[in-house]
Amino acid sequence: MSITAERKAEVIQGNANKAGDTGSPEVQVAILSERIANLTAHFKTHTKDNHSRRGLLKLVSTRRSLLDYVKKKDEARYKALLEKHNIRR
């Protein structure tokens, strides 16, 4: 499940470090978290949708890789990201 362009713009604006920032790890993690939340809601009604479940696992893995990168570069930013998006570690 994808997110709408309007919702994606809101997520980017809420997490951007500066104007026009769409590629920072914070923004990427925020977008992935939004997509993961949408898929999680989808699975509440479609429990046997294993093809989408594989996509969810790929999204979680990508987010995990980005979080590992942020943790390696700056632990304070990493902890702030976990807290802001309610991500369990």
UniProtKB/Swiss-Prot annotation:
Cysteine-cysteine disulfides: none
The UniProt record lists the keyword Secreted: no
CDD domains: Ribosomal_S15p_S13e
Listed Basic and acidic residues bias regions: 1-10
Start and end residues of each stretch annotated as Disordered: 1-24
GO cellular component terms attached to this protein's record: cytosolic small ribosomal subunit
Alphabetically ordered keywords of this record: Ribonucleoprotein, Ribosomal protein, RNA-binding, rRNA-binding
Single GO MF annotation: rRNA binding
GO annotation terms (biological process): translation
Superkingdom per UniProt: Bacteria
InterPro entries: Ribosomal_uS15, Ribosomal_uS15_bac-type, uS15_NS1_RNA-bd_sf
Quaternary structure and partners: Part of the 30S ribosomal subunit. Forms a bridge to the 50S subunit in the 70S ribosome, contacting the 23S rRNA.
PANTHER family: RIBOSOMAL PROTEIN S15, BACTERIAL AND ORGANELLAR (PTHR23321), SMALL RIBOSOMAL SUBUNIT PROTEIN US15M (PTHR23321:SF26)
Family designation: Belongs to the universal ribosomal protein uS15 family.
Function recorded in the entry: One of the primary rRNA binding proteins, it binds directly to 16S rRNA where it helps nucleate assembly of the platform of the 30S subunit by binding and bridging several RNA helices of the 16S rRNA.
Protein name (Swiss-Prot/TrEMBL): Small ribosomal subunit protein uS15
Source organism: Rhodopseudomonas palustris (strain HaA2)
Gene for this chain: rpsO
